[in-house]
Amino acid sequence: MTQHFIVIGNPIAHSKSPEIHTLFGAHAGLDICYQCQYCPDDPASFTAVIEAFFHGGGVGANVTVPFKQVAYECCAARGGLSEHAKIAGAVNTLSLNQALLASGVSRAEALYGDNTDGQGLVNHMQRLGWPLNGARIAIIGAGGAARGVVLPLIEAGIEALTIANRTLSKATELVNELSTASVVIHNQQIQTCCTADLSGDFDIIVNATSIGLSGETLPLADELNCQYAYDMMYGRELPFLQHFAARGAQTSDGYGMLIGQAALSFECWTGHAIDVTQATAALEKSSI
């Protein structure tokens, strides 16, 4: 029997998730169908689409921008959340709480949320050989994408973290939530600032906004420098990476992170572990 999966987002046409998960399914010997699902940018539409998908027999769903926080709220009121999702306040992987289903709860009310983004990012940076232990890191953005990666980066041993956002209050809100959850870096306060005010030298700067997908540029200060620049988006030329490459930084888009978080989601849904290095090589070969 075919198992059905989706990735829901807006925009979504650029997503490579169907290609990745189809490869995973073939490697695991499973018959799967994984499709992109566009959704209007409002919570009611997201909820309606997800409920219809799972009610119709769907097995699992990935969530991308701009719905990760909406997905969190949906799961918090229904089937529950993993610890990483709770701390992040964002969900990128939806499945069904099997215990609740067994108790007679409807599929729509058994939605369970996890967040594999952060571990996918950390795993990719480690495969690239980027030093995380003791690193000084800045994250641009304070939405669902940023929320998902903060805790895994801290767990990887970073030394200091600055969260920059166009609206300072949103960055401050994220830090306050992390403080409430007792997330600290060596008992140091996580710093915040407006994106335009972010300056100084960092080991790694991560763009966790989707602004590059539209070809727009971030308001980056001339005094902002790094050794490594990472954009969580992928699939096209990204101004953020071009900016730091011109300054001599090593750069990477988020395709490797996508593969890593996808492997964790796939294992959550099917129980099959994926060799990410092998899968990445196969995907790169197929795209030549």
Swiss-Prot record:
GO terms for biological process: amino acid biosynthetic process; aromatic amino acid family biosynthetic process; chorismate biosynthetic process; shikimate metabolic process. NADP(+) binds at residues 83, 141-145, 165-170, 232, 254. The active site is at 68 (proton acceptor). InterPro entries: Aminoacid_DH-like_N_sf, NAD(P)-bd_dom_sf, SDH_C, Shikimate_DH, Shikimate_DH-bd_N, Shikimate_DH_fam, Shikm_DH/Glu-tRNA_Rdtase. Pathway: Metabolic intermediate biosynthesis; chorismate biosynthesis; chorismate from D-erythrose 4-phosphate and phosphoenolpyruvate: step 4/7. Homodimer. This is Shikimate dehydrogenase (NADP(+)). It comes from Psychrobacter arcticus (strain DSM 17307 / VKM B-2377 / 273-4). The lineage of its organism: Bacteria, Pseudomonadati, Pseudomonadota, Gammaproteobacteria, Moraxellales. The gene is aroE.
